[in-house]
Every structure is written in C-alpha cells, then in structure tokens.
Amino acid sequence: MTRDENGCGVFHLTDRVYLTAADVRALQLAKAAVAAGVQILLAQQGLSLSALDGLYLSGGFGMYLDPASAAAIGMLPRLPAAKLHSVGNAALSGAAQLALRGNMSAADGIVNRLTYLELSGRPDFADAFAENIPLRSMQWR
C-alpha cells in the first residue's frame, strides 16, 4: 500500500490498477442506496423475497454487475440465478419497440399500471440507507 498526494491510502492491485478509500466509499454509498431501495420497494408492496418471480437489473449497472458479488456485500438479496435477469438498456429497448410498432395503447396500459415511488425524502429510506452502508451480507426479509 502507498499514499497518494493527499496522504490517503492507495492499495495497488497491479501496477496500473489500484483502489482508494474514495473508491470504497463510493461502493458503500451505491450499495446502501440499492439495498435500501430494494428493501423499501418490497415493504411498500408487502412482499417477501420468496414472493418475487424475478429481479430485473437494467442499464450499465445491470449489464456489468456480478449478482453473486453484489449479494456477498449485501447490495442485492441472494436469489437463485434463475430469478436474476439482466435486461440491458430497458428504457431504450422499450422506446425502440414502441417506435417500431407504434402501439401507443400498449404503452398507455403499462404507464397506467406504474407507481412512482420517491425514496429520497422518506425517513424509512434514510434509516435503511444508513443500515446498509457496511459491506456485509444482509439478512434480507
């Protein structure tokens, strides 16, 4: 381990790849936000993990995330591999399908079934976020 120009520790994985305290903190914050979000969504719907048919991971996050590693640090619940689905850029794919098919009534039907849930101002989210900062596997409910 060495120190950077600010005196912060730098852990070298190779001569060109290294990990800093800022990297670990960014991981902790992302992990806490995702885990808290999943917990709040489940609680909001009154669901347990066993009731889920699947967990869909989208965008660059979903494409490159290793679900086993994410579960090991508590970012995601431990689920059977068959219940974890990486769907790529779902928003772009959906928009492209809509543009090609021109079926606005189907899109309206989906929109009418959606519920927007703002997490940032919720006290239960703040509590779950703080609880999920440590990098450890969680006992998901």
Label each region the model flagged.
Residues 1-141:
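Helical "lid/coupling" subdomains associated with nucleotide-phosphate turnover
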